[in-house]
Amino acid sequence: MAAFSCLDLQEGLRTLSILQWIPVYVLLGTLSILGMPYLLLFTTLWPLSVLFLVWIAYDWNTHIQDGRRSAWVRNWTLWKYFQSYFPVKLVKTHDLSPKHNYIILSHPHGILSYGAFINFATESTGFSRVFPSITPFLATLEGIFWIPFVRDYLMSLGICPVSKLSLTHKLTQKDSGNAVIIVPGGASESLLSRPGVSMIYLKKRQGFVKLALKTGAYLVPSYSFGENETYNQETFAEGTWLRFFQKNIQKIGKRILGINLCTIHGRGLTRGSWGFLPFNHPITTVVGEPLPVPKIPDPDKETVEKYLELYISALRKLFDQHKAEYGLSKTHELKIL
């Protein structure tokens, strides 16, 4: 009986670790957006708000530069429960020499990019042990860093804005040993996420190649097998009012928040039930061989296209070499749009 109780407790802690993830950002954002004005206007604690605003002004560019990473936050026990919920695994196929900087491309986006977050923004899968002397910076939407408290929380995890200024700084201010992680499919790719489907947007994504050429950073493919299995996604039939409503909600979400609001469902609080928790499906992120890139301050179109094709070939090779090992058939194809 004690063994069953222990197992139930562990399962409960894993579930709670997932449940807290998005609400924490909402809570921190609400505290900063509503709490500070309230203290300023309606309480005798207004000096705290003034000091906080002065600090924000002073600290405004930190997230664009080196951030404020905390090894303590990245090693929270919370993330071990988060990682073991699926579970998530990090697999290295080649060493990353600390003599270079890197752009690691994470595919696919999935619904919430669990694999990228756990492997690169926490130490629950041992990134620092697997890739010693490499400092990872997971890139996400720049707008999130406009929200006080949220930006500090993200910086403590080593997360940075996916902006040209921020990424260029991290790839040039330190000669070697930095790795920025980009999810090139972005919000649009989340709409492609479905169990059993391996489809990504890449053929028109040239920004990361230009960045690599301008900074001389090596390109590194990575693929999270199982990422698309974490949620079921519904796309309603064309011509129905449900599809009309779905399209408009997605347009509004993309315009205002920079994200696509997907119609998803997963499991409930108990296994086998229906709800909005992700399915407990293993996610294995395989990091491939670095692709050397020359430093060219002003690369022409042909050079950019050449290295994009080289990268696509490297990604296909990585996918095909490991797909059968991580749950896909040997004939399963990666579709690149």
Swiss-Prot record:
Name of the molecule in the record: Diacylglycerol O-acyltransferase 2-like protein 6
Reaction catalyzed: 1,2-di-(9Z-octadecenoyl)-sn-glycerol + (9Z)-octadecenoyl-CoA = 1,2,3-tri-(9Z-octadecenoyl)-glycerol + CoA
Organism field: Mus musculus (Mouse)
Compartments where located: Endoplasmic reticulum membrane
GO biological process per UniProt: monoacylglycerol biosynthetic process
Function in brief: Diglyceride acyltransferase that uses fatty acyl-CoA as substrate. Particularly active with oleate as a substrate. Has no wax synthase activity to produce wax esters.
Alphabetized InterPro entries for the sequence: DAGAT (IPR007130)
UniProt similarity note: Belongs to the diacylglycerol acyltransferase family.
Positions of transmembrane segments: 22-42, 102-122
Keyword Acyltransferase: yes
Membrane topology reported for the UniProt record: Multi-pass membrane protein
